[in-house]
Amino acid sequence: MDNPHYYSPPITRNVIGKRVPRTEDARLLTGRGKYLNDINVDGQLHACFVRSPAAHAQITGIDTSAASEMPGVHLVWTSADIEQYCAGIEAQYTAEGCEAMTMPLLAKDVVRYVGEPVVLVVAESRAAAEDACDLVGLELEHLEVVLDPRKSIQGGPVANGERPDNVGIRGRASFGDVDEAFSNAEHVVSALYHPGRVAAAPMETRGCLADYEWTEDRLKLWVSTQMPHYVKMCLSLFLGFDESRSEVISPDTGGGFGQKAHVFPEEMLMPLASKHLKTPVKWVEDRRENLLAGSHAHEQFVTIQYAANAEGRITGVRTHALVDGGAYHMPPQTMAVECWATAAVTPTGVYDIPAAEYVYEGAVTNKCPMGAFRGVGYTAGTLARESLMDDLARKMKVSPFEIRRRNVVREFPWTNPQGVVYEEGSFLEVIDALEEMVDYPAFLRRQDEARKAGKYLGLGISVFVESSGESTGMMQAHGATDVFHDTATVKMDSTGSVTITSGLNSQGQGHQTTLAQVAADVLGIPFESISVDAGTSTKGAYGSGTIGSRAAVIAGGCVNRAAYAIRQKLVAVAANMLESSEEDIVLEDGFASVIGAAESRVSIADVAMAVYWDSSKWPAGFEPGLEFTKAWDTSRPMFSNGGHALIVELDPVTGFVKVEKVYSVEDCGVIINPTIVEGQIRGGVVQGIGMGLFEQLAYDNAGNLSTTSFLDYQTPTMDVSPPFEIRHIETPSVMTASGVKGMGESGLISAPAAVLNAVNDALSPFGSVLYELPATPEKVVRATKGIIDLQGPQDWSELWERAGVPALDRGPMDRE
């Protein structure tokens, strides 16, 4: 379904590329937005959950009598009450070696992580439901807990009886002659990296409101989600609701970042409760619940090894990615969403490495399940690749820019060892731009002067490539069979105004603005005459979800195709009205005009009026109507690229690290709206700073989460947001009509690696290197004293033999 990317005549970029103010902002910033918790319906009841206080325990008894008898309580359910409706939910995405697991809606017999839903209570108010939850008696017999994925995967205590070996996923692959690369290597560098466990922590937590109308057998579900059509499918797949009689509505959503790209047990229970009670039921989680049970992200143990020649040219890479997957697979992605992407997609990155071998494993543990979060899989993989590249630079005694230049891909199209084609890119240009922006020689002088004064500055860089526009073609290129496609409807009325209905909903990305910009240029009409419904209801256009940096590419592609179909009809009628050939008609600035005869023109509004009301203006064989629904699904993956450089100042006494400035270079093809793109860069990088320096979901030895509020879980605030300098490079994609690529995840993909590299650069006078995030003050102070908590494996063979990979020919560490 790829669209032709050349138009005849060419479409003028009048609105695309402009800093058009976001049309949705006035409504949202003045408090006129309508989020999930703003929506109420007559007669609604409120739901709360009794959640497991234990990480792993046998349920020996549940006493709900007192809660059931409490005034105002309408329903108290345990797993026994819902078995007749649903056996549980399962993930659908495919990945080699992924083992099926069922997540119960309410824990049955065994609880497997702190925060797992055990009992549902529905009452006339939230307060009453919470009070009733306190009256539920829960008797547990504690079982052995496994929290470390390294112990779990090696036969530790069984975390989930469905997977007695604790393996949620395991796979391997090899491309090129990896053994030869390592046998002939002049240098081998290796390291183990551990990005910590983090939360997406959207400003708006999860929630839903189910309204089942029993007289018509119809369900309406409002839900804070990134994937409303997937939620609708799950209502049918797991609960038996008729899709044709179900509507899922996604209202204004206060952030998602991947966490809301799942279906959760709570979201399936509300429709069941509403159907049972014949009244609406609402559930909105509090922050503690969100941090306990809203899916976790990014924690992996990534072991990576480079083989390099005498000049530092990398000839082979081996990667082992072990994810702490938690107690279950999260639908739809499974725990493969982290380890598979880290191992299979990221090890070569922007570098021309001819041979690659990888193993990915997902360990089942007694923690909240692992889910998607901005940069999923890419963040950990980029951290390992880019940090080890700095290790190689130190070994070769060259700058971090130079070592990357020696290895970067320079000619396109380029095919990586896995067979994935990169049609275009600006990999070298990004490295050069970053070095120029930071003025590297000047920084080195300033760093030296600061050290003499007892201050420690560090520079960290990270360059990346990001697959964007998640599509069926992209999944097929990586060996998966999952289907992604979307549709959009574009309708022009008789006055020339346009309404767009997109299948992709927004969580603050600015879809209403960017999609209108795309249509404005295709149709040649003012931006202000276009309104956009961005996926608010499944009654409209279809969407596979606002995930994977796909909105501008996929939703934009759908709008582009539908608008272009309208454009062709406008051109046909305008040519007839102006007595010209269609090839000579240009649509621009609200007018249809003849090339070379500016005075010969007619307003597009008049052309639209003729289409609707005056058949005398039609050419022969013309069919009425100015409304089209078009689908879009790119046949091959496309990639944006870029890089970030951070300068930090490190205090060796307190261990505090301050980010002084961020330099960002982004190539996402043709930029629709620079202001929106830069907002995405800033937001993603600041999230990366949080992950790099202080965000961490911490468990104690019993499996209790210690960070259950924003007092403990430290998200970045404006006081840690540094100044930015941003530069754009435009390498248009040959896969899209407008040349656009996706970029929403790039900041969090790359920034944590830049943070770690900057901290390690600042630590270099102390002879220490950190391999673990976050780089907390405690870890930094210990590093200044030569104490490093995380050490790489001394025997690599066990990592590979576990998955059937031969032991390495070279030693694990070759660092000077």
Curated annotation (Swiss-Prot):
Location(s) in or outside the cell: Cytoplasm
Pathway(s) the chain acts in: Alkaloid degradation; nicotine degradation; 6-hydroxypseudooxynicotine from nicotine (R-isomer route): step 1/2; Alkaloid degradation; nicotine degradation; 6-hydroxypseudooxynicotine from nicotine (S-isomer route): step 1/2
Catalytic activity: (R)-nicotine + A + H2O = (R)-6-hydroxynicotine + AH2; (S)-nicotine + A + H2O = (S)-6-hydroxynicotine + AH2
Function: Component of the nicotine 6-hydroxylase, which is involved in the degradation of nicotine. Catalyzes the hydroxylation of the pyridine ring at C6 to form 6-hydroxynicotine. Can use both L-nicotine and D-nicotine.
Name under which the protein is recorded: Nicotine 6-hydroxylase large subunit
Free-text comment on the cofactor: Binds 1 Mo-molybdopterin cytosine dinucleotide (Mo-MCD) cofactor per subunit.
Source organism: Paenarthrobacter nicotinovorans
Keywords per UniProt: Alkaloid metabolism, Cytoplasm, Metal-binding, Molybdenum, Oxidoreductase, Plasmid
Sites where the protein binds Mo-molybdopterin cytosine dinucleotide: 745
Enzyme Commission code: 1.5.99.4
Listed SMART domains: Ald_Xan_dh_C (SM01008)
Cofactor: Mo-molybdopterin cytosine dinucleotide
Superkingdom: Bacteria
Organism lineage: Bacteria, Bacillati, Actinomycetota, Actinomycetes, Micrococcales
Family annotation (InterPro entries): Ald_Oxase/Xan_DH_a/b (IPR000674), Ald_Oxase/Xan_DH_a/b_sf (IPR036856), Ald_Oxase/xanthine_DH-like (IPR016208), AldOxase/xan_DH_MoCoBD1 (IPR008274), AldOxase/xan_DH_MoCoBD2 (IPR046867), AldOxase/xan_DH_Mopterin-bd_sf (IPR037165)
